[in-house]
Amino acid sequence: MLGPQIWASMRQGLSRGLSRNVKGKKVDIAGIYPPVTTPFTATAEVDYGKLEENLNRLATFPFRGFVVQGSTGEFPFLTSLERLEVVSRVRQAIPKDKFLIAGSGCESTQATVEMTVSMAQVGADVAMVVTPCYYRGRMSSAALIHHYTKVADVSPIPVVLYSVPANTGLELPVDAVVTLSQHPNIIGLKDSGGDVTRIGLIVHKTSKQDFQVLAGSAGFLLASYAVGAVGGICGLANVLGAQVCQLERLCLTGQWEAAQELQHRLIEPNTAVTRRFGIPGLKKTMDWFGYYGGPCRAPLQELSPTEEEALRLDFSNNGWL
């Protein structure tokens, strides 16, 4: 049974054609997006009140939109109903002119199709689909092209590919990205791998398509802009939103020396809340910066005192605390 909040959002989505975007029409997704965390109570329930509080503060920054139910949102630990409810609540909380990109990836193609359609119905403007990875040994380019094509064929909203090899152990091959860029309902890629050469190559090889690449981390945002990326989905923007948006402005206006200086000061904090300490580190930092971070869902554990001190140093040594 779907909850009343979700049914209400579905009715609203159906009344507006499921999305502000028209299927098959390319949309401009350039800009900075924070991948929103999922707040939990002490009993591991989703805390929708704290979610709204965080969103209200994040909405004061010049983000292009918000990414919900990505890796930072702990989506593998949420039920399907919770994933939809979170997206529904975010849609209601954020300004109407902000894009809502929702993670809809599942392991099977059928489940991904169903989740993508449901995400559109509760208010998502764009679906972000992570690579299926449990059977990664059989996830060839052909298998992945088939998967994404089936999803994009049915999806009522545009699709963004999502490659995050640090979590999946699988990098979406360049040849697959190039092929998929030709699909009229696939508009871009979030690449979290950190290989700027790869990002530049993808931008180059998809230049004849209306295809956009978003950097998946603030740590290589400047370099990504330099090779043709149009924005970033950056976990660090949850705590240093103004600074990440400033880096975007510096890059877009060609102020490369100032951009380089700022980028240097973001690298260590970014690494700390991504690869080094992950979501527990990001949530702890959110608590320090006046947001609600709170606990993660098990099996993710809180930081040890030693880890917490190291995290604090990564921010204080760069002038952020």
UniProtKB/Swiss-Prot annotation:
EC number: 4.1.3.16
UniProt note on regulation of activity: Inhibited by divalent cations.
Entry-linked Gene3D superfamilies: Aldolase class I
Site positions per UniProt: Involved in proton transfer during cleavage: 162
Binding site for substrate: 71-72, 192, 216
GO molecular-function terms, A-Z: (4S)-4-hydroxy-2-oxoglutarate aldolase activity; (R,S)-4-hydroxy-2-oxoglutarate aldolase activity; protein homodimerization activity
EC main group: lyase
InterPro entries for the chain: Aldolase_TIM (IPR013785), DapA-like (IPR002220), Schiff_base-form_aldolases_AS (IPR020625)
Active site: 190
Catalytic activity: (4S)-4-hydroxy-2-oxoglutarate = glyoxylate + pyruvate; (4R)-4-hydroxy-2-oxoglutarate = glyoxylate + pyruvate
Record: transit peptide: 1-23
Key words, A-Z: Lyase, Mitochondrion, Schiff base, Transit peptide
Main location class: mitochondrion
Cellular compartments annotated: Mitochondrion
SMART domains named among the record's database cross-references: DHDPS
One GO CC annotation: mitochondrion
GO annotation, biological process: 4-hydroxyproline catabolic process; glyoxylate catabolic process; oxalate metabolic process; pyruvate biosynthetic process
PROSITE patterns given in the database record: DHDPS_2
Described purpose of this protein according to its UniProt entry: Catalyzes the final step in the metabolic pathway of hydroxyproline.
Complex and partners: Homotetramer.
Family designation: Belongs to the DapA family.
Protein known as: 4-hydroxy-2-oxoglutarate aldolase, mitochondrial
Record organism: Mus musculus
